[in-house]
């Protein structure tokens, strides 16, 4: 019997993920011949810790072992955070990315700036200029695509201040990007 569909995996684990305090960001099921992969992306406002993700991975594995959907086919289970390349599509993504630099594509222009506070249906974006950083409000419905950018140097303290700082439990931009600590992955081969 093949690995179950994305929808079935979501049905099996969504309550467990939510009870553990995480948001289920995505599920990907990859069929690769006789050995398939199930990748589960989770996140939370407080970020992810490796030990907690390892525990969640083991609990998800137990759920999969308790149902017949997986049959005898081998598969790899990977529980991970979305990582830096994920587009910002939900309000919670904007909240969690506060203080990070992002490329924001609008209908007629592209804005690159530091994500600030979310207020209703708009977000503050701190844009650097020759006279110093400035705050611009951008309506969420006007955003066609937004992706956090990798930073290799420490952010300007004034930009961070105008952006409202870094959310509690999140890693400062250059620290996360340089160390690779932002994406947490726990995998199991079954």
Curated annotation (Swiss-Prot):
Gene3D superfamilies: RimP-like superfamily, N-terminal (3.30.300.70). It is found in: Cytoplasm. It holds the Pfam family RimP_N. Residues 178-190 have a biased composition (Acidic residues). It comes from the Bacteria. SUPFAM superfamilies: YhbC-like, N-terminal domain. GO terms for cellular component: cytosol. Keywords: Cytoplasm, Ribosome biogenesis. The keyword Cytoplasm applies. Its main location: cytoplasm. Residues 159-190 are annotated as: Disordered. One of its GO terms (biological process) is translation. InterPro entries: Ribosome_maturation_RimP (IPR003728), RimP_C (IPR028998), RimP_N (IPR028989), RimP_N_sf (IPR035956). Required for maturation of 30S ribosomal subunits. Belongs to the RimP family. This is Ribosome maturation factor RimP. It comes from Rhodococcus jostii (strain RHA1).
